[in-house]
């Protein structure tokens, strides 16, 4: 592990995937080659062109953070990358000292708590990611979210959340932290 002045530098927001194959708002997001992707229907350069297979794999990421003398990384998820739980659970097992990987249930579906419970209890994720800016108005304080936060607090699972613009979710997150005072929350 790299240390600088006896401190370990941690990348607190990173993404890994073997391929992007999803859609958002009815528009496709797909990996191509040479770091290019179809993103919301438009071909764009998503990654450096030397990443010819368009994978942002743990091994490629580790080579970059090793070069930058970064000791570890928190891996979050985003709907626009597609759910990466299957890949990230293997990364977490293979590199437990280098990555804290966050699982992500599909919050857009009713009954997502069962997915969250599986990610935490059976698959062993140490964090859960919420792309709050993509919840389409769903409150952080709804019953299912609060059940998930209570489970996370009980199992000492970190919440990594990106908040939407404005202050609505700030107040909601204050309610969450009041109800679950031992829940560890990382906001980006």
Where are these regions (language model features)?
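An N-terminally biased module of ancient metal coordination in phosphate/nucleic-acid-related enzymes
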Residues: 1-77
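Hydrophobic faces of well-ordered beta-strands that scaffold small-molecule active sites
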Residues: 10-14, 73-76, 100-103, 126-130, ...
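Conserved, mostly hydrophobic/aromatic
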Residues: 13, 65, 88, 119, ...
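Acidic-and-aromatic substrate-binding clefts and catalytic sites of carbohydrate-active enzymes
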Residues: 52-54, 77-84, 106-112, 135-141, ...
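Short, well-structured secondary-structure segments
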Residues: 61-64, 69-91, 96-106, 129
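Substrate-binding cleft of extracellular glycoside hydrolase catalytic domains
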Residues: 100-136
């Amino acid at each position: 592990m790299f240390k600088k002045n006896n401190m370990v530098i941690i990348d607190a927001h990173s993404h890994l995937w073997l391929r992007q194959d999803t859609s958002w708002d009815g528009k496709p997001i797909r990996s191509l080659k040479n770091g290019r992707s179809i993103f919301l229907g438009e071909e764009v350069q998503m990654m450096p062109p030397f990443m010819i297979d368009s994978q942002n794999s743990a091994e490629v990421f580790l080579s970059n953070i090793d070069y930058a003398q970064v000791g570890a990384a928190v891996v979050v998820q985003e709907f626009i990358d597609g759910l990466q739980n299957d890949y990230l659970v293997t990364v977490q097992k293979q590199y437990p000292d280098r990555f804290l990987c966050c699982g992500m249930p599909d919050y857009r579906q009713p009954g997502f708590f069962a997915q969250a419970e599986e990610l935490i209890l059976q698959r062993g994720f140490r964090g859960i990611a919420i792309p709050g800016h993509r919840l389409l108005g769903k409150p952080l304080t709804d019953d299912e979210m609060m059940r998930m936060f209570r489970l996370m607090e009980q199992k000492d699972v970190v919440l990594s959340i990106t908040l939407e613009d404005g202050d609505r979710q700030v107040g909601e997150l204050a309610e969450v932290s009041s109800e679950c005072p031992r829940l560890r929350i990382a906001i980006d």
